[in-house]
């Protein structure tokens, strides 16, 4: 089974150009700009390219005083992000960082995270997004394996950085005390006063390197560069066509920015000149309060955060919400329905992976009509579903999912790669295209078990158990079984104050 939305979307320059223009107009990207500011935007892109450096500099030229990001401590404009990032870039250059190097960023969501990312981009260096959950040895392995030249970290990680980063140059992104030490971003910016260095173009565009453990448990760097202008426009417009983001909106960024989904929404914010409202740690009550305080139209989150938002008592005014965009893990069908019943039909669930990027989106209509679906394959994406011999399966049949687009990764920095069929890479899942044209993901290709001669996927049982009112969370795994060959075991977390028994749960899934 092949779904080729790349050919259908971009067949012919006129058709593709009209589609881009229509969506760009709808989201507000074609609003008039003063000629002098338009020239400044063009100069920024020519100097920095279509990188984080270029996009923030262009936004600063267009609307310097617009709010770019708000965290616990401060509100920072686009012009100030541009200025601070130039100061930090100069400090990194003094520490030996240059084009083609890699700088690790070990930080939680904050304005300093964005300043650091843009500063690294201004040097033409790669940004390596380190997981804030890393233990010291994991961090050390990644820094050595990815040939990192410097590290920027929140000072809460000072102990493991000092123990495992060796003699690497380092700067501190967020300092918990808030006293701006000299080797922190805040301290370096304060020492510079109102000035900012005039930096040369690096001549190369750095990459985003996102760490993924896949099925091995060992972090691997998935590198993604800047696609060419046409392919980049097609991919961006396809996503904007599926999820109704608006230019100049306000997004509460709850998802961690060091993961692909959080970084993706940060990038959307760059493109659309959105205000990003974020906090270093997720708290469901705070997220809903921020929607009311800022009149936010979007929340970017992961599914488990939706469950916690549903558990919040009280009712902040969330009437401005138009989008709750989710990715990062499977969305339980019952959770989708309950969330929309409370907050309205605002839920958009995106399916993809760190390596492949975006594959499909299930919007509110999809989730109401077919709650288990991963949605429609995005325009600009090609999907093949194949059997064990790499032959395309018939529509409706389950097979291994391969996908690709201009946003797919270049390969792992180690030189390894995913299993491929031509230009398409394996997602590691099995699924099918239904009669309704929607994609359905049945589970991981290595999760399926054969129990009593039947193919069974843990996700099916997880979805069923999520429908029990006493169940907060569940994980299902396969184990060896003398009678059936293999069987499934469910590990269940009950809600506080509930008392469902094993027999109750067994009866629920029958």
What are these regions (language model features)?
Residues 151, 289, 299, 405, ...:
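AMP-binding/adenylate-forming catalytic core of the ANL superfamily
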Residues 1-76, 80-95, 503, 507:
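N-lobe entry segment of adenylate-forming
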Residues 77-79, 207-234:
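Conserved AMP-binding A3 loop
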Residues 82-87, 222-246, 307:
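Conserved structural elements of the adenylate-forming
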Residues 48, 74, 89-134, 455:
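Conserved AMP-binding/adenylate-forming
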Residues 376-380, 391-422, 454-456:
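Conserved ATP/PPi-binding loop(s) of AMP-dependent carboxylate-activating enzymes
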Residues 271, 297-300, 311-370, 382:
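Gly/Ser/Thr-rich phosphate-binding loop
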Residues 230-250, 258-298, 312:
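Conserved AMP-binding/adenylation subdomain of ANL enzymes
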């Amino acid at each position: 089974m092949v779904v080729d939305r790349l050919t259908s979307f971009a067949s012919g320059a006129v058709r593709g150009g009209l589609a881009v223009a229509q969506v760009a107009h709808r989201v507000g990207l074609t609003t008039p700009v003063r000629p002098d500011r338009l020239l400044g935007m063009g100069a920024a892109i020519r100097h920095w390219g279509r990188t984080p450096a270029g996009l923030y500099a262009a936004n600063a030229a267009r609307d310097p005083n617009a709010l770019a990001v708000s965290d616990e401590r401060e509100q920072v404009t686009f012009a100030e992000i541009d200025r601070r990032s130039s100061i930090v870039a100069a400090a990194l250059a003094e520490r030996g960082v240059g084009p083609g190097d890699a700088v690790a960023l070990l930080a939680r969501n904050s304005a300093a995270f964005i300043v650091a990312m843009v500063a690294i981009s201004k040097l033409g260096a790669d940004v390596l997004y380190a997981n804030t959950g890393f233990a010291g040895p994991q961090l050390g392995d990644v820094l050595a394996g990815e040939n990192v030249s410097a590290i920027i970290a929140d000072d809460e990680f000072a102990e493991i950085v000092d123990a495992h980063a060796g003699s690497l140059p380092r700067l501190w992104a967020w300092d918990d005390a808030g006293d701006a030490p000299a080797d922190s971003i805040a301290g370096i910016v304060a020492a510079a006063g109102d000035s900012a260095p005039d930096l040369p173009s690096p001549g190369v565009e750095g990459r985003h390197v996102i760490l993924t453990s896949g099925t091995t448990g060992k972090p691997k760097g998935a590198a993604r560069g800047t696609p060419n202008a046409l392919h980049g426009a097609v991919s961006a417009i396809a996503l904007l066509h599926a999820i109704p983001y608006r230019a100049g909106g306000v997004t509460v960024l709850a998802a961690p920015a060091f993961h692909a989904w959080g970084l993706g929404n940060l990038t959307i914010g760059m493109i659309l000149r959105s205000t990003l409202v974020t906090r270093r740690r997720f708290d469901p009550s705070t997220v809903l309060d921020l929607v009311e305080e800022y009149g936010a139209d979007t929340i970017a989150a992961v599914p488990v955060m939706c469950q916690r938002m549903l558990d919040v008592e009280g009712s902040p005014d969330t009437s401005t919400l138009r989008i709750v965009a989710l990715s990062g893990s499977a969305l339980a069908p019952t959770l989708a329905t309950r969330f929309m019943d409370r907050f309205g039909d605002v839920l958009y669930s995106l399916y993809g992976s760190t390596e492949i990027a975006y594959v499909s989106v299930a919007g509110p209509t999809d989730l109401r009509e077919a709650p288990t679906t991963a949605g429609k394959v995005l325009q600009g994406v090609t999907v093949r579903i194949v059997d064990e011999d790499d032959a395309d399966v018939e529509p409706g049949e389950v097979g291994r999912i391969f996908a690709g687009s201009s946003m797919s990764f270049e390969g792992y920095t180690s030189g390894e790669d995913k299993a491929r069929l031509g230009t398409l890479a394996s997602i590691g899942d099995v699924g099918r295209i239904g009669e309704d044209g929607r994609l359905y993901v049945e589970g991981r290709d290595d999760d399926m078990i054969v129990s009593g001669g039947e193919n069974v996927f843990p996700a099916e049982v997880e979805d069923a158990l999520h429908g029990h009112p006493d169940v907060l969370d569940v994980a299902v795994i396969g184990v060896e079984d003398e009678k059936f060959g293999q069987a499934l075991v469910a590990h269940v977390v009950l809600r506080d104050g509930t008392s469902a028994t094993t027999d109750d749960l067994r009866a629920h899934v029958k």
